[in-house]
Amino acid sequence: VTTQDIVGKLWKLCDVLRDDGITYHQYVTELTYILFLKMAKETGAEDSIPAGYRWDDLAALDGIELKKFYRQLLEYLGTECQGRIREIYNGASTSIDEPANLKKLITSIDELDWFSAKEEGLGNLYEGLLEKNANEKKSGAGQYFTPRPLIDVMTKLVKPQAGEKCNDPACGTFGFMIAAFQYVYSHTNGFMDLDGDQAQFEYEKAFTGCELVHDTHRLALMNAMLHEIEGRIMLGDTLSPLGKNLDGYDVVLTNPPFGTKKGGERASRDDLDVLTSNKQLNFLQHIYKSLKKDGKARAAVVLPDNVLFADGDGAKIRANLMDKCNLHTILRLPTGIFYAQGVKTNVLFFTRGTSDKDNTREVWFYDLRTNMPSFGKTNPLKQEHFADFMKAYEAEDRTKVEDERWSVVSRAEIAAKGDSLDLGLIKDDSIVDYEDLPDPLTAAENAADTLEEAVDMLRAVAKELKQLGV
């Protein structure tokens, strides 16, 4: 039994709950509450859960008693417990109305092959569920899932080292930090090359994040816990004053959310160089501010095309970035890997300088977009798609790389173009600006209206056919 099989079974259970009108995202959250108790039992970690509120206590009940106890359990764990458990269950409520559905969910989870699941790693199992959820629900609240192959490529090229502080200021379900943890783990012989204090630092302090959306924050905590990572994951907005304290990092890996701040207001940070309502530009400013000023601290960040072209504030922020950091590489990503087919994104790789001036001399571009297939559900992005880019990136002498997708532009040429980074590329006319994307709620309401109209028309046709005796 593979992780995929178990994920498939857990996912099928969602159909049971569709009758209760539960969305996929609510299902994953609900599943997290129940899975947590089962996984604690399976891994011998039940001591951290108060007696009377454990898996067996839940599994023993049914009917209205079960429903009542489950609600009580959620509230108790979210208020009376300490640490991670309290964070995961804080403010938890259930969307399951029908006790029989809740019982079916508990029974089905109990019947899964937990021996195989443990062999494969419970963390992998949970990440599989999160990925499935992301594919079912590509957009919404500006949240989306970064494809694992892209996370792995970015992590491999940034090369986090033991002893370094790594952070994701918009951490979603914590995928980047888990990849960074696994990278360090595998490059230190499972931390065996480190002494006790060093290994403890990796587990407890090296990998941290911040997430704005409460439900997503829960999933991040659960994901981290299943991978034995105890680093702090804050619930809050990096672009609020809270973000000022997120600094002194050696490595930042992130894919900040799409869209503008609600209502287009400016970030409430007073320490950013340029005040703008463009969320990605604010995240970019936060990231280069949050790196240690030591000539080694580095970041890889997924950003939309408008960050490369926006004039005014955008040009100022890019000039700042190129002054304070060596922006050495930009990877133009193919389309279709995020929720909206037309949305175009890039990965910016940069290293913080020791000074605040003239750190970028030239920028290398790799165009992985032009003449590439569009990726999506039927054509998923895989790590091999990045092989040529990785070869060019890691080349000892970048000028000797023979690849038509690889080009370099000097800082002077960039300045001559008003600090636009729309250079060295085949012009593509289908650029979508994030500001022009419809608000997810409006888009959903419009779609619902259209479907209702279609249903009404079909009913009218059926009625007419009936009258005609067809």
Regions found by a protein language model. Give the residues of each.
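Non-catalytic, mostly N-terminal accessory regions of nucleic-acid modification and defense proteins
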Residues: 1-162, 232-243, 332-336, 359-376, ...
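Short acidic (Asp/Glu) and glycine-rich catalytic loops that position anionic groups and cofactors
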Residues: 11, 200, 228-233, 263-267, ...
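Short loop segments at secondary-structure junctions
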Residues: 40, 351-355
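Switch/connector loops and helix/strand junctions flanking conserved nucleotide-binding motifs
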Residues: 242-244, 259-262, 309-312, 339-342, ...
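Conserved Class I SAM-dependent methyltransferase catalytic core
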Residues: 27, 212-217, 277-350
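Conserved S-adenosyl-L-methionine
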Residues: 140-254, 259-261, 270, 275-277, ...
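Short hydrophobic/aromatic beta-strand or adjacent loop that forms the aromatic wall/cage
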Residues: 343-347, 376, 386
